């Protein structure tokens, strides 16, 4: 290799995962014409360097958002445990859920949500070994915040259905602190013990 650092942790991870072997196997199946074009575009060096970019400097696989420590391969469900998530990120998630609940009239819209940005920012704010369980926990809070808003709107207007407009002042009484005060741990999940969303 002329442009590949074979001592890097990225290269070693590439080799351990069998990706390098896959590159070599693909090369063996190329016709002479394909091999010529392959070499014109940089050959194995280019392919290996591009694949190495999928790992951080520690050799940990990066997810689609460029965050290491999020690979669950071979971990079963051991990462699905509750852990402490800072008030800052719980508040950011609550504010986002509330904004999007109002904006989308209670419907979860995967096209316009900013939740992935909050998760990524959170993940980058903690050590790699805390990212999976922290993300699991933040997702638990997110679901409970959304559920509390649904319950509040439904209590004020029993005929309301997600997608229909509603009086957004109903949610003035729904705060992160109120929702969290009703949550209890149930195994690896957060559930509501009880909630008072009287208007």
List PLM regions with ranges:
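Type III/flagellar secretion export determinants
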Residues: 1-199
């Amino acid at each position: 290799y002329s442009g590949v650092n074979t001592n890097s942790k990225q290269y070693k991870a590439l080799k351990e995962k069998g990706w390098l072997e896959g590159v070599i196997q693909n090369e063996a199946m190329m016709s002479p014409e394909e091999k010529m074009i392959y070499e014109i575009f940089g050959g194995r060096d280019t392919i290996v360097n591009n694949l190495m970019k999928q790992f951080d400097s520690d050799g940990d696989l990066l997810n689609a958002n460029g965050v290491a420590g999020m690979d669950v391969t071979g971990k079963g469900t051991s990462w699905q445990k509750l852990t402490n998530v800072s008030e800052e990120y719980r508040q950011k998630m609550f504010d986002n859920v509330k904004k999007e609940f109002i904006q989308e009239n209670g419907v979860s819209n995967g096209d316009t949500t900013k939740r992935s940005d909050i998760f990524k920012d959170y993940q980058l704010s903690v050590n790699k070994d805390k990212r999976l369980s922290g993300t699991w926990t933040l997702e638990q809070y997110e679901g409970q915040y959304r559920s509390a808003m649904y319950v509040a709107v439904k209590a004020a207007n029993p005929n309301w259905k997600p997608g229909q407009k509603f009086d957004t002042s109903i949610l003035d009484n729904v705060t992160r602190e109120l929702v969290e005060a009703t949550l209890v741990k149930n195994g690896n999940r957060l559930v509501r013990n009880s909630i008072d969303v009287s208007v």
